[in-house]
Amino acid sequence: MSLLTPLIWILILLPIILLALIKSEKGQLKYLGFFILYFLADCYIQQLSKQFISIEFMGLKFSWVGKILSLLMSLTIIYAVSKSNRQEIGFTTKTNAKKQVIIGLLFFFGFLFFDLIFKMILFPKGGAFDLETFAFQATLPGLTEELAFRGIGLWLLEKAFPPKWTFKGIKFGWGFIMVTVLFGLAHGVFLTANHELKFDLITIVYLSLISSLSVGVLRKFSGNLIYPILGHNTINIMNAIIRIL
């Protein structure tokens, strides 16, 4: 994947950013710059580590090093900010009201059930069990991506664009929309090393409206990152299980 790919993701997101700038109440726009810098740094840490740090000699095929470095960077930022900011990021064991948590869980599991049926029909079956696949999918992607997207990323964007829509006592805003869409873009758009653009619209729409939206709602209604991390990893494990049925 070309190093230009993360810039393409931001470029595609630009219309939503511009719309947010027009429609939002005045926020602290420096945080939009911080978000872009953080997002690009996270992307390039993972990309460059994959290029320059090989662990194939250990028989491992997934990007363990990149994900661990991403995790370390996120944790460094989280522990560098104040306790109140950590709670805003979602790095806390505190939750919202029980009723709100239940709403988030019902929303997530409703989407998860749809996701299960859809993938049971479409996913190729009969793959071999692979321990590394399960170990990786059950841990690092959910942990690192939730810290990045619905943790630090969402926190920075909500500083830039204060949420103004309220549903069941939970505030939503342009930041929520941006991280939801950006997650889909990061899984459905990439520029190859030969500068060939791959644009999978179905993947972008599906991941944005199903996976990303469901864990995003779970994050907002639960009030912390524990629930979306567990939810994200549940989706990944479910995908791996379906492929070996």
PLM feature spans:
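Residue-level signature of transmembrane alpha-helical entry/exit and packing/kink sites
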Residues: 2-6, 27-35, 63, 67, ...
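N-terminal, membrane-interfacial amphipathic/helix-forming hydrophobic leader that caps
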Residues: 1-85, 237-245
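Juxtamembrane helix-loop-helix connectors linking adjacent transmembrane helices
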Residues: 53-67, 75-147, 158-163
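Compositionally biased, intrinsically disordered low-complexity segments enriched
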Residues: 48-49, 102, 189, 234
